[in-house]
Amino acid sequence: MALLAIIGTACAGLAAVLAAALVALAYRFGLLYQLCHKVDPRSPRHGGELVAEVLKAHGIRFLFTLAGGHISPVLVACEKVGIRVVDTRHEATAVFAADAVSRLSGRIGVAVVTAGPGVTNTVTAVKNAQMAESPVLLIGGAAASLQKGRGALQDIDQLSLFRTLCKVCVSVRTVRDIIPTLRKAIATAQSGTPGPVFVELPIDILYPFHVVEKEVGGTKTPRGLQGKVVQWYLQNYIRNLFAGAWEPRDVSPLPVQVPMATEDEVQRCVELVSRATKPLVLVGSQAMLPPTPAEELR
């Protein structure tokens, strides 16, 4: 009886471990999410449209870029919603221009560059924005998530370049994550001490389903068990990218956390200065927040 109890306990433990492993795998492959959210393979929509919606809702009027294939859907979609797309001759110039717009308008500046060399060319300008405490959103294209580290076109570790320069460095993994990631990044850039943020958008979340399916999933009929397993994995990967992609989501700006002095603190400073015989006031950059657009100062 004791032996049977031990065997039963061991089997129950093994079953629990296997069940936990299966749940973890289902979560890893997005199977649980796909059960509850729709995938529309025939939809002509693409992730660039979601980027444009967020930027438009945040009052962005200008987008600076040097055009590239990885980011083309973003540029096309932004132009369609009325955002002026300014094509520069160098990626650093695009970020410098976004920095200038941010300082003059009081809104976040936006630059969009292609993967690899397009991103690396912006480093000097991003560092300048960091030192100037300018809220700038840098959107960089990237290789498909599935192909990273496998010799894809212009594939490098872009996030490591900006971790010491930007307040946030993040890579978006699915189409449904584009809107919440951009909203949070923009709010972070403008909150506290303003500064640049970097959002990486892999190419497979920016193009329509049928394009990604053709490029990633392939068109040949798989042969053998191994081929069928690989085909299933690729198809599931693509479906997870687009699951719930076009469900309605809030694109409005998140609250910006700007440190403000209380009335008591201001009054205490006034009293100190008024009593001083040789007053010296050291004013930090936070005193300029929230920013006032230049046209309102006329």
Model-based region annotation:
Residues 2-298:
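N-terminal alpha/beta PP-like core and its mobile active-site loop of ThDP/TPP-dependent enzymes
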